[in-house]
């Protein structure tokens, strides 16, 4: 074990001087002897000084304090002992439930699996959310992004997905809270507890109020735990909320380390940092990692470098739109903007593909006709267009759905709709079978059978 001493402290950046023969390597974890604070080596400056980022608050530090090199990167506990626990970036428990007592620790910096170890993803993962299963189906072992601006429902959608998939899917889940609100982390913990799925979920939190080092590395901590489960032969779900905060923490660290900023003030290493994280989130011949990531879109601009860099790595993108939310339709998924590589007749089958494309084409036609309707009114449309508009408005409302995790706010019981029922429902609307039903009958409801049941008397 080699020791050095602190020579400079600038916020979260701490310089440490070592002797000639004991220079730490990049990404080595150092421990401040007096406070127990962990530092991660980012740069070697020359004159035997290394520049580090603190994995915690730097209050109470002073120049001259002794620092010990642990001789390797940050290591975190992995395995079944982490299930049902809340941990920080260093894998230390923060839920006041005692030691984790793990037998195995893994370093958070690892290489992505080799090309020959990878396994392609073609099997569908049913979520029970109509709009997602129909328009942008998820692949088991794929990567999904939930894109949206502030307050359009990314976290609520993610909580619903976790609840539905964790109950239906018997594998393990890892939730990595990156730079999000502490309140949401607390709500999430209690939601998992009440749904009786907490014993299958590992929770790793690095909240908004924590230093940039914690927020930058907490995604890697969660990913390392998921990789262990995958390599043990399990199918794992990895939830990251929010990838944008990961990028933002990287921007802060980059500026603190004195790097020249790139476009819109982001770090020059944005693409390589994102690639290093995303390439590790993959499925191998041993097991799979299905990843669902919330992506905040600054100022609702999808061309911003952060969301734009994330797009390249994903198999499916669920775009949450403010325009849809303004209509009171939740989940506020934009069916025309959301995409999935799985929406292919060879994967989902001809019927599913044709119904999904039919729904998109009717909604696109309605979008084109909106200006004419606003200026001239419905009467000026052809009979065919009137039918299209009527069906589009029913489809729009039928894409809404009551969530289990929102029951306390809405008072409406949540609904899980199977993929088969979803396809049957939208096909019935497209084929004109539901033309006699009022629009409002389709709002915030589960399957098409419920629409028929509740409106039997009215017809």
Swiss-Prot record:
Keywords (A to Z) from UniProt: ATP synthesis, ATP-binding, Cell inner membrane, Cell membrane, CF(1), Hydrogen ion transport, Ion transport, Membrane, Nucleotide-binding, Translocase, Transport
Protein name: ATP synthase subunit beta
Taxonomic source organism: Ruthia magnifica subsp. Calyptogena magnifica
Ubl conjugation in keyword set: no
Any one GO cellular component localisation term in the record: plasma membrane
GO molecular-function term, one example from the UniProt record: ATP hydrolysis activity
Record's subunit section: F-type ATPases have 2 components, CF(1) - the catalytic core - and CF(0) - the membrane proton channel. CF(1) has five subunits: alpha(3), beta(3), gamma(1), delta(1), epsilon(1). CF(0) has three main subunits: a(1), b(2) and c(9-12). The alpha and beta chains form an alternating ring which encloses part of the gamma chain. CF(1) is attached to CF(0) by a central stalk formed by the gamma and epsilon chains, while a peripheral stalk is formed by the delta and b chains.
EC top class named in words: translocase
InterPro entries in the cross-refs: AAA+_ATPase (IPR003593), ATP-synt_VA_C (IPR055190), ATP_synth_F1_bsu (IPR005722), ATPase_a/bsu_AS (IPR020003), ATPase_alpha/beta_chains (IPR050053), ATPase_F1/V1/A1_a/bsu_N (IPR004100), ATPase_F1/V1/A1_a/bsu_N_sf (IPR036121), ATPase_F1/V1/A1_a/bsu_nucl-bd (IPR000194)
NCBIfam families: atpD
Taxonomic path: Bacteria, Pseudomonadati, Pseudomonadota, Gammaproteobacteria, Candidatus Pseudothioglobaceae
Main location: membrane
Membrane disposition: Peripheral membrane protein
Location in or out of the cell: Cell inner membrane
Family membership: Belongs to the ATPase alpha/beta chains family.
Cited function: Produces ATP from ADP in the presence of a proton gradient across the membrane. The catalytic sites are hosted primarily by the beta subunits.
Pfam families attached to this UniProt entry: ATP-synt_ab, ATP-synt_ab_N, ATP-synt_VA_C
EC identifiers of the protein: 7.1.2.2
Reactions performed catalytically: ATP + H2O + 4 H(+)(in) = ADP + phosphate + 5 H(+)(out)
Entry binding sites for ATP: 148-155
CDD domains named in the record: ATP-synt_F1_beta_C (cd18110), ATP-synt_F1_beta_N (cd18115), F1-ATPase_beta_CD (cd01133)
């Amino acid at each position: 074990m080699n020791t050095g001493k602190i020579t400079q402290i600038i916020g979260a950046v701490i310089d440490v001087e070592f002797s000639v023969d004991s220079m730490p390597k990049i990404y080595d974890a150092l421990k401040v002897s007096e406070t127990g604070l962990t530092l991660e080596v980012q740069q070697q400056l020359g004159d035997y000084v290394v520049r580090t980022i603190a994995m915690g608050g730097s209050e109470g530090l002073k120049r001259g304090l002794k620092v010990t090199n642990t001789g390797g990167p940050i290591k975190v506990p992995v395995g079944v002992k982490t299930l049902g626990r809340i941990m920080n970036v260093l894998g230390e428990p923060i839920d006041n439930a005692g030691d984790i007592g793990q037998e195995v620790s893994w370093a958070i910096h690892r290489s992505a699996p080799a090309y020959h170890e990878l396994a392609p993803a073609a099997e569908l993962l049913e979520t029970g959310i109509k709009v997602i299963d129909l328009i942008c189906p998820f692949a088991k072992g794929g990567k999904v992004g939930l894109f949206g601006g502030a307050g359009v429902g990314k976290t609520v959608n993610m909580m619903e997905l976790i609840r539905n998939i964790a109950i239906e899917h018997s594998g393990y889940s890892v939730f990595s809270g990156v730079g999000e609100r502490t309140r949401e982390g607390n709500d999430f913990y209690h939601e998992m507890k009440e749904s009786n799925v907490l014993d299958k979920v590992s929770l790793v939190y690095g909240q908004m109020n924590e230093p940039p080092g914690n927020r930058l590395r907490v995604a890697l901590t969660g990913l390392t735990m998921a990789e262990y489960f995958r390599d043990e032969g399990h199918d794992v779900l990895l939830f990251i909320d929010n990838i944008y905060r990961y990028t933002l923490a990287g921007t802060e660290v980059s500026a603190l380390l004195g790097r020249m900023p790139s476009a819109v003030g982001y770090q020059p290493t944005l693409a390589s940092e994102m690639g290093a994280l995303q390439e590790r989130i993959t499925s191998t011949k041993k097991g799979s990692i299905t990843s669902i990531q919330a992506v905040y879109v600054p100022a609702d601009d999808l061309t911003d470098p952060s969301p734009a860099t994330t797009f390249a790595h994903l198999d499916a993108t669920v775009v949450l739109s403010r325009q849809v939310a303004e209509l009171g339709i939740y989940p506020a998924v934009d069916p025309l903007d959301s995409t999935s590589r799985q929406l292919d007749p060879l994967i989902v089958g001809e019927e599913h593909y044709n119904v999904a494309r039919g729904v998109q084409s009717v909604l696109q036609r309605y979008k084109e006709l909106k200006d004419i309707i606003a200026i001239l009114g419905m009467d000026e449309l052809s009979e065919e267009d009137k039918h299209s508009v009527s069906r589009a408005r029913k489809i729009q409302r039928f894409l809404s759905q009551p969530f289990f995790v929102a029951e306390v706010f809405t008072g409406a019981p949540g609904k899980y709709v199977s993929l088969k029922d979803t396809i049957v429902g939208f096909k019935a609307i497209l084929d004109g079978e539901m033309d006699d039903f009022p629009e409002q009958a389709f709002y915030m409801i589960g399957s098409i059978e419920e629409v028929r049941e509740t409106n039997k008397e009215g017809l």
